[in-house]
Regions:
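Flexible, solvent-exposed loop/hinge segments and secondary-structure transition points
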Residues: 1-167
Length: 167
């Protein structure tokens, strides 16, 4: 597994913010964690409110800790609250259970890090995060369609993302 570079991390965040501007999102914040859960980069747009670092980090950390998009971690919390309570205690409450956290994978599907984005509705946080990942030629779980590869990589696919503000 190759490491995620600082240059890639900063480029992912820049592309995430560009997508947010394109979609007319509220001020965003984004964090990149390496595969070991350590902070690689964080940025907060002007006008973003407080606690954004902690929220972004919690979304990305939840994705890494449980190997799935943070919106699927939220679904698991609803299915198995005792499991998630125990996991939260083990993680010193470091996980934030909302959409906006995505695993970052290389071309082979190995996890090289995670992104956490917050500032708008969860779906838009995810859409912008995935745009950032794609901008540097990396992949999210949404990019894998081969059933054998999905099984091998233990990918859990979330339902397709759409902008809920356009309903």
């Amino acid at each position: 597994m190759r490491a995620l570079s600082l240059e890639q991390a900063n480029a992912i965040i820049a592309a995430t913010f560009a997508a947010a501007e394109q979609h007319k999102c509220r001020p965003m914040s984004a964090i990149i964690l390496d595969a070991g859960g350590r902070v690689k980069a964080f940025q907060k747009q002007d006008g973003a409110s407080m606690l954004r670092f902690e929220i972004c980090q919690g979304k990305a950390y939840a994705s890494l800790a449980l190997g799935r998009a943070s919106r699927l971690v939220l679904a698991k919390a609803k299915e198995k609250p005792l499991f998630m309570q125990s996991a939260g205690e083990l993680a010193d409450q470091a996980m934030f259970l909302e959409g906006g956290g995505q695993l970052i994978r290389d071309a082979e599907g190995e996890v090289v890090g995670a992104i956490g984005v917050t500032g708008d509705v969860n779906e838009m946080d995810d859409i912008c995060a995935i745009a950032g990942i794609h901008a540097v030629g990396l992949k999210s779980d949404y990019d894998f369609d081969d059933p054998e590869q999905i099984r091998k990589l233990s990918i859990l696919k979330a339902p397709p993302l759409t902008d809920p503000r356009k309903k």
